[in-house]
Amino acid sequence: MTKEQILVDVQEAIAEKLGKEQSEITLDKSFKDDLGADSLEVMELVMDLEDKFEITIEDDQAENLKTVGDVVSYIETQV
């Protein structure tokens, strides 16, 4: 799976969870500051991504995933 495909899949999940347009979900966007996600939404998104990519994201690792780019890079190392 390419980084670009991971990004598209992550964008789709974020758009669905947060009600955002995929075009505004870029690698540099912060979940909380730019996309307006609260802590619960971020944790729900992590669970959705775990299911989508069939991976496990440990809680301590999830806390370090602040931007869309962080998530894409992490998933890239896991698939």
From Swiss-Prot:
Residues 1-79 form the Carrier domain. Carrier of the growing fatty acid chain in fatty acid biosynthesis. The modification O-(pantetheine 4'-phosphoryl)serine is found at residue 39. GO terms for molecular function: acyl binding; acyl carrier activity. This is Acyl carrier protein. Pfam families: PP-binding. Belongs to the acyl carrier protein (ACP) family. InterPro entries: ACP, ACP-like_sf, PP-bd_ACP, Ppantetheine_attach_site. PANTHER family: ACYL CARRIER PROTEIN (PTHR20863), CARRIER DOMAIN-CONTAINING PROTEIN (PTHR20863:SF76). Its main location: cytoplasm. Keywords: Cytoplasm, Fatty acid biosynthesis, Fatty acid metabolism, Lipid biosynthesis, Lipid metabolism, Phosphopantetheine, Phosphoprotein. 4'-phosphopantetheine is transferred from CoA to a specific serine of apo-ACP by AcpS. This modification is essential for activity because fatty acids are bound in thioester linkage to the sulfhydryl of the prosthetic group. GO terms for biological process: lipid A biosynthetic process. The lineage of its organism: Bacteria, Bacillati, Bacillota, Bacilli, Bacillales. The gene is acpP. The keyword Lipid metabolism applies. It is found in: Cytoplasm. Pathway: Lipid metabolism; fatty acid biosynthesis. GO terms for cellular component: cytosol; membrane.
